[in-house]
Amino acid sequence: MAEISSVPFAEPPYLRGLPSPYYNESHRRFQKACRAFLYENLLKHAMEWEKAGTVPEHVFSDFCKANMLLPNLPAPLPVAWLKRLGIHDILGVKVEEWDYLHTGIYSDEMARSGLSGPSGSLTAGFAFGTPPIIKYGSKELQEKFLPDLLTGKKRNCIAITEPDAGSDVAGITTTATKSADGKYYIVNGNKKWITNGIWSDYSTMAVRTGGPGAGGLSLLVVPLKNYPGVTMQRLKVSGQITGGTTYIELDEVKVPVENLIGLEGDGMKMIMNNFNHERLTIAVGVTRQARVALSTAFSYCLKREAFGKTLMDQPVVRHRLAKAGAELETMWAFVEQLLYQLTNLPKEEADRQLGGITAMAKAKGAMVLNECAQTAVLLFGGAGFTKQGQGELAEAILRDVPGARIPGGSEDVLLDLSIRQLVKLFKAEEKKLGKARI
């Protein structure tokens, strides 16, 4: 349904008529248009497609025609490029007016089916593979790739993770060595768990152009589909089934040196900045998934009877719902605040001040999703353990939880990173003020 739900926990407070300092008329108009579009083109079929394991190809084209892939880019949008391509608005919002609160609305609405796979099958590669080209790519590189990527004529993905290097980005071993004539990088290695990889024409790939450690990493646009030396295999995963998770083998792959993004050795810096956007949008999306899980269970508890009364009449059930609900609404307040701060800070300042907090938000969002999904499955009982019937959505959301806790930086790594970043920021501020260090 595209209407606003009255079920407790089903909607963010601002959509239930409660006052909010964050959203202006542009945001509210976009939310209505976004919900209507997504319901017709994605959400009402999401469970059917997830069960089938694939989203029809025309859906990606439908999103491109409506400019509905573009909200996945960091705000502010690349206005000059979009206008050059004849793109002036997204569902009525002028591209130059787009901010991170619009992005948050989009990410929230995209997850309203409760399933991350169908939406991720369309957006993940574009969302995280395209921004480095926009931000760091040379003029020639942008001219070569952006027209087709921004209009959806070609697809790309982000390829960082390897079989033996996930959150430890500095440990990747895929190499890119220059050919004797200096015209090509020869790429060898493997990438694993690459979302959307199987459908991608290109990947923004982390490669090792130098020695060990972070300083030896670079980013390279590597052709994938039907390209010599590239073999791709779709992986079977427990959740996010429609996401196109892919294993990529690279054997003597010749990539033009012009496909280098930025400078050799700057890969780690670019990857880390790119992670901020990825982690924020994940945090928003998983918070909506948590909403779907908890509100679905809430509705079920109002009608399901046990021991002569409804589940909702059982104090222990209300206690479970209250604990999960408190976590959920606290998390939403956290991400709304982050979205507002990102909207009102220059990008460089936001990266400096909010990188650690964004990592914390992504980790906490996944924890909240786990709490709400576990609660929902327990309250559904046997129905929550069944891949059909009234508990099938709660069951599917619980299988999505590892896909929230691991990608984009695993939970424990991000919690540690968040504090290290805050300590670093604190010491820099203290030094600037001339105070003693801790």
UniProtKB/Swiss-Prot annotation:
Give the EC number.
Answer: 1.-.-.-
Tell me its family. Belongs to the acyl-CoA dehydrogenase family.
Q: What is this protein called?
A: Acyl-CoA dehydrogenase apdG
Instruction: State the protein's purpose.
Output: Acyl-CoA dehydrogenase; part of the gene cluster that mediates the biosynthesis of aspyridones. The polyketide-amino acid backbone preaspyridone A is first assembled by the PKS-NRPS hybrid apdA. The assembly of preaspyridone A is initiated by loading of malonyl-CoA onto apdA, followed by decarboxylation to yield the acetyl starter unit. The growing polyketide chain then elongates into a tetraketide. The adpA PKS module catalyzes three Claisen condensations, as well as beta-keto processing and methylation.
Q: What induces it?
A: Expression is positively regulated by the aspyridones cluster specific transcription regulator apdR.
What Gene Ontology cellular component terms go with this record? Answer: cytoplasm; intracellular membrane-bounded organelle
Task: Give the cofactors, semicolon-separated.
Answer: FAD
Query: Origin organism of this chain?
Result: Emericella nidulans (strain FGSC A4 / ATCC 38163 / CBS 112.46 / NRRL 194 / M139)
Question: Enzyme class, one word?
Answer: oxidoreductase
Xref: PANTHER family = ACYL-COA DEHYDROGENASE APDG (PTHR48083:SF15), MEDIUM-CHAIN SPECIFIC ACYL-COA DEHYDROGENASE, MITOCHONDRIAL-RELATED (PTHR48083)
GO BP? fatty acid beta-oxidation using acyl-CoA dehydrogenase
GO molecular function terms listed in the Swiss-Prot or TrEMBL record:
acyl-CoA dehydrogenase activity; flavin adenine dinucleotide binding
What keywords does the record list, in alphabetical order?
A: FAD, Flavoprotein, Oxidoreductase
To which pathway does this protein belong?
A: Secondary metabolite biosynthesis
Q: Which InterPro entries match?
A: Acyl-CoA_dehydrogenase, Acyl-CoA_DH_CS, Acyl-CoA_Oxase/DH_mid-dom, Acyl-CoA_Oxase/DH_mid-dom_sf, AcylCo_DH-like_C, AcylCo_DH/oxidase_C, AcylCoA_DH/ox_N, AcylCoA_DH/ox_N_sf
Pfam entry (one): Acyl-CoA_dh_1
